[in-house]
Each structure stands twice: as C-alpha cells, then as structure tokens.
C-alpha cells in the first residue's frame, strides 16, 4: 500500500510542514507515504485565459511525469464528488479490494488542474465548493487519509 500526495508548489510555512510531518508519521503505521512537490509556474497577477491555460499545462506536465502508469489517481477538484470521512474510507477500501494499492492524490496550483491531468484521474474528489490554499489542503487531505485508515481498521479516532 502506498499513498502519494502530489502537489504543485512548495510548503513554505513551518507550521504547515510540522502538521504534515506529524500526519506522515501517524500514517506510516498503515501505508508507505510520499509527498512530491512539483514547481509552480511563475505567472503574472493578471493573466489572460490563454496564459492561465499555458500555466496549467506546464504544471500538468510536471504532475503527469510523476504518476506511474498503474497508479490510482484521485484529483482534488471543486467539481469532484464530496464524501464524508466514512465515504472516503469506503471508496479507498473498495479500490483496495479490487487490487488497487498505489494511490496518488493530486492537488493543483492556484489556477487548478489542466485537462490532461483531469483525464488521467480515476476519481475526482472535492472537500468543498470553496477554494482553499494548496498548503492547507495538503494538511486537510493527509489528515483525512489517516482518518480513513483508522475507520477501515475500526480503530477509535476523535470526532
């Protein structure tokens, strides 16, 4: 079992790094965990739609280069399916039962994910209709993956 969190951009703030580190440690009891960061594309403040697409395409190429062919790709998207914590655990368990053991959760940059990445996705997951900073989403995601493993194992975890 391997969980990869693949994200555009680097974590800069110490408090986000500490939170991620804590959940990496907790999650390692259940799965191999890897966090891969790809560089975000430098972009001016006010971009045209064409420039935004170019940025998304370049970031998308970097993301796709890190995904193995056999990986189950779960993209975080505003338009994705919203699940409860139990629902995420059930979805992961269902996929594991089918023999899927290499999960890659993909978090896009500030402009979102390119169509090429969305096409590679096996499952579109949404945490909210709201937009969150990608640094925060990494922490929320890794905590929810950890919680999913606790639920799958029937272990107690605070609510």
Swiss-Prot record:
Pfam families: SPOUT_MTase. GO terms for cellular component: cytoplasm. The gene is rlmH. Its EC number is 2.1.1.177. This is Ribosomal RNA large subunit methyltransferase H. The keyword Membrane does not apply. Homodimer. InterPro entries: Alpha/beta_knot_MTases, RlmH-like, tRNA_m1G_MTases_N. It comes from Staphylococcus haemolyticus (strain JCSC1435). Keywords: Cytoplasm, Methyltransferase, rRNA processing, S-adenosyl-L-methionine, Transferase. The keyword Metal-binding does not apply.
